[in-house]
A protein has these predicted regions:
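Serine residues within intrinsically disordered or low-complexity segments
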Residues: 2-5, 11
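Short amphipathic alpha-helix with an adjacent loop that forms part of the alpha/beta core around
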Residues: 131-134
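Charged helix-capping and loop-helix junction motifs
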Residues: 81-85, 177-185
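Glycine-rich phosphate-binding active-site loops on the catalytic face of alpha/beta enzymes
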Residues: 119-127, 164-176, 204, 209-229
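Glycine-rich adenosine-cofactor-binding loop
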Residues: 181, 196-205
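Small side chains
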Residues: 42, 67, 198, 219-220
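Conserved N-terminal beta1-alpha1 strand-loop-helix module at the mouth
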Residues: 10-122, 136-161, 203-206, 227-229
Length: 229
């Protein structure tokens, strides 16, 4: 079985800085994503990038994942915002939805209505003042990461529109920690009405994607493989 990702459908226009890279690369040998409907979310990690980071982002976008999560949450807020102003136009150029991470005020300031929030942050915002709640209502996509059924149910109550559940397979990102596995993923998928994306140890492997799909996942997230393109 062969696979390709599709676009989530959320888009926006960034005015002003229109930094676009023009690297021409052959990614076909790296991607098992041609001609299918199983969505793959690319997750960034500049520490793993095989090329200069913006160059790497363009390589990822040329592969046309369903979306790119700009995860660089260890950056200071101002540095993250600066990076986002560079990444968003690249995503727009390739018609790839960009989901910003953690810094929701900056996302709104940049006109991006897709955000991924750590669950503790989503929890605190949901219990915050009315102004914060009104601002969160400006997002069309609100994702969060979960590691249990209870967390998935909580995320749904708090207004998340998707969850990333993991880690599903063995991964270097979670060294020494046993994967939660496909049974866990299946249970999460059955427990919530939200789209659930598997994360952790996911590769460009159609057989693996079939396992995720059979467990009920709406798609999968790939970090390391995307940063190695």
């Amino acid at each position: 079985m062969s696979y390709s990702s599709h676009i989530l459908g959320y888009s926006y226009i960034i005015k002003g800085d229109t930094f676009i890279m023009n690297t021409k690369i052959d990614i076909s040998k790296n991607m098992a994503t041609q001609n299918s409907n199983f969505p793959i979310l690319a997750v960034s990690n500049r520490h793993l990038a095989a090329h200069p980071f913006l160059d790497q982002i363009e390589r990822v976008c040329q592969a046309h994942p369903a979306a790119l999560i700009l995860r660089e949450k260890d950056l200071p807020a101002e540095d993250y915002k600066t990076l986002a102003t560079r990444v968003l136009p690249i995503c727009q150029h390739y018609n790839v939805s960009c989901i910003l991470h953690t810094f929701w005020q900056d996302a709104l300031a940049l006109g991006c209505t897709c955000i991924h929030l750590p669950l503790p942050l989503l929890r605190s915002l949901a219990g915050a003042d009315e102004t914060a709640l009104e601002k969160l209502a400006g997002f069309s996509v609100i994702g969060t990461s979960v590691h249990s059924v209870d967390e998935a149910l909580e995320a749904e109550r708090l207004g998340a529109t998707y969850v990333a559940a993991g880690h599903i397979y063995v991964t270097d990102c979670k060294k020494g920690l046993a994967p939660r596995g496909l049974k866990f993923l299946q249970t999460v998928c059955k427990s919530v009405s939200l789209p659930v994306y598997g994360i952790g140890g996911i590769k460009f492997d159609p057989a693996q994607w079939q396992e995720l799909e059979s467990a009920g996942a709406a798609g999968g997230c790939i970090m390391s493989g995307m940063m190695e393109l």
